Amino acid sequence: MSVTSLIDTALDRSVVLGYGWPGLLVRKVLPDWPEGPGRMDGKVVLVTGAGSGVGLAAAVGFAGLGASVRVLGRSEQRAEEAAALTRKQAGDDVDVRPVVCDVSSLAALRNFTTRFLEEEDRLDVLVNNAGVMPDERQYSVDGVELTFATHVLAPWVLIEELTPLLARSAPSVVINVTSGGQYGQQLPAGDPESEETPYSPKKFYARTKRAQVVVTEKWAERLHDQGVHVHSMHPGWADTKGVRQWMPVFRAVTRPIIRTPAQGADTIVWLGAASEATENDGLFWHDRRPRPTTYPLAPGADSEEVREELWEYVSSLAHGERA
């Protein structure tokens, strides 16, 4: 292992330095820091959860590279605000359009994807970034636990429904934005929505982020031959509206080293534009490098039986059936 690899790995395993801005700054000066991202003129990018934080920063980054960006908000007002903020930060001459969908609703997702397929000629990058962390257990309009519906079911439906457009634009990239918190959880066997687990906002958030990583790998296997490359990534510790609202104590403790949203979004934008994303499939990225999905001292890898159970369960929900 090279010296630069040792430094990078040490930062990653330290968590505190690797997930904060010091890790990104150190990695950027290492000799093997990946180049790019390059220009994206003529390409179309769809970003969910684009109203603030990492999602907004990603939209700004893509627009700055020349991509046509669709910013998704759950209401017309939120989508318009996201588009205005993107233009304000990226420049008035960028191509940014608001699109509307409550991603926790299956009907809304179907209506949105139907319209999107009718209105758009291509889709080069899909970024699934929308996230929630309710204080108490809540359910979507379809009766699905809200964190699961937003983080796991919604990306699943968007990928499935938009695959024809992604395949037509191949090579294309899907980026599921997850969290380093996924390292602390395993998927619960026989209980995908954690109905048998007392509700804990942080635990449910992390568990659904773990599920995102697993579903990403499953999609990557299925879509590779169509030229659609599916990846997951985590942004590290970024100073977002969600962190301020849902994790104020954590934010206060990590404030000296917490990343800006743009620093958190760096790998999202890079993956959307770099050849590394289309040369690989199903990887879990942080700071422009693939990372392990488990660590020695963290909960172990999920069994193939549990992984397949999750896939079948989400598929059944997406198609209006309970497994």
Predicted segments with their positions:
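Non-catalytic terminal and boundary segments that flank Rossmann-like NAD(P)-dependent oxidoreductase
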Residues: 1-44, 302-323
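Catalytic loop of short-chain dehydrogenase/reductase
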Residues: 36, 131-148, 167-226, 234-252
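Conserved glycine-rich cofactor-binding loop
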Residues: 44, 51-53
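A glycine-rich helix->loop->beta "capping" turn
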Residues: 89-95, 115-128, 134-140
